[in-house]
Amino acid sequence: MRLAEFDRVPPAVPTDPDAVSRRTAEFVVDLVETVAGQYSGPDMRSRKVALPVAPVPAPSTTASPMPGPRSNIRLDEPALVTLDTIRAAAEVIRGVVVRTPLLPFGRPENGDPLGRTRAWLKPESLQPIGAFKLRGAYYNIATLSAECRAAGVVAHSSGNHAQGVARAARLLGVRAVIVMPSNAPRIKVERVREDGAEIVFVGPSSEERAERAAELARIDGLSLVGPYDDAATITGQGTVGLEIVEQLAALDERQSAVPSGGRTELAPFTVLVPVGGGGIASGVAVAVKSLRADAVVVGVEPALAADARDSLAQGRIVTWPADMVGRTIADGQRTTHIGRIPFALLRRYLDGIVTVTEDEIVRAMVRASREARLMLEPSGATTLAAWLFHEDELPASGRVVSILSGGNVDPVRYDELLARGVAAGG
């Protein structure tokens, strides 16, 4: 993979549980935090950045520090997101969240008698709410104390996290208040209402949503369920990566004709994960790299909202104006800046970022519909776009798994986007 290199010092992450507890107590912060750095102007010509990966420690054999039940104090420390906590989250969400399949995409490679394909899809669009967000939302709320659940929760989201929190809260019998932007897709607003959540509308920027949610949490005593800058939410999203590694291992075992109970070496692989605020990207990166240090994890952003690329390239959180990120059709990735916790984790675990154009996104939506019979929203198609149109920027060998984050799109809007994709060369 041809990635431009730059110097970066991975953040120190304590491994001792007692040290983690002390650091957590010391670093509990306000619900809204001023983002480090100022807008410095996106370089739209840059396609990707290289992220040096620190050595990945062996999986811990001690109990994880992620407590449960939790108070409504936020768990901000990146050290709380570990393979152990992600495995624990997988047990908590079992039976609520779908273990989405790995689907082969495209034709088998020539001359392969086993019919193996290089590209695989992880369609989180098949979740009960049509997106991966139920994972983090359910785990977050389920591990709150009974007292906190009785008081209720508040969240801010452009759509899919809102649906995840609304559904999780309904399943757990918890009051939910959701702060949404005035330009949120209608279909997502309707589904949040259907699950019984109260909706508060604000302006289009993520800062406005975060500030209003923090205000409601303070006034009404609600627990904030963060969309991405929240260790519990990130941990829940990381279960996607855990499943990918397990499913690829099972696939290799079957294709190698290894008897049940036998062992086979997992072939090299790459995971493409969308980056918005960084919740799923950081959770998946932690899970995958903790299990397979030789795996490659690449983030994918719209070129019109590539703040994470700039942040990781510059070694500080860079903010893009709301009117700039608002240009992309990928509404789930219109965050103006990456979260503080995801930033720390991605600096340590992510291998690189690829950006995709608007035409590439809609063309990927067309290909998903035609070849995989999957209905994807624009944000759900960015990783497939990276595979289809930027394969030369990825490792030359091994399987490539694209995480398709969601499929919540208004039918009329979906038809318009497909028509645009066909016109662009679909």
Label the predicted regions.
Residues 1-2, 10:
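N-terminal targeting leader peptides, primarily classical Sec-type signal peptides for secretion
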Residues 2, 23, 45-47, 60-64:
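Low-acidity, Ser/Thr- and Arg-rich intrinsically disordered low-complexity segments
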Residues 3, 14, 19, 23-40:
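Polybasic, low-complexity intrinsically disordered segments
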Residues 6, 45, 52, 63-426:
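PLP-dependent amino-acid enzyme catalytic core
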Residues 7-10, 14, 20, 49, ...:
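Short linear segments in intrinsically disordered or otherwise low-structure-confidence regions
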Residues 19, 28, 38, 42-43, ...:
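Intrinsically disordered and other compositionally biased segments
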Residues 21, 40, 60-62, 260:
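Intrinsically disordered, low-complexity serine/threonine-rich segments
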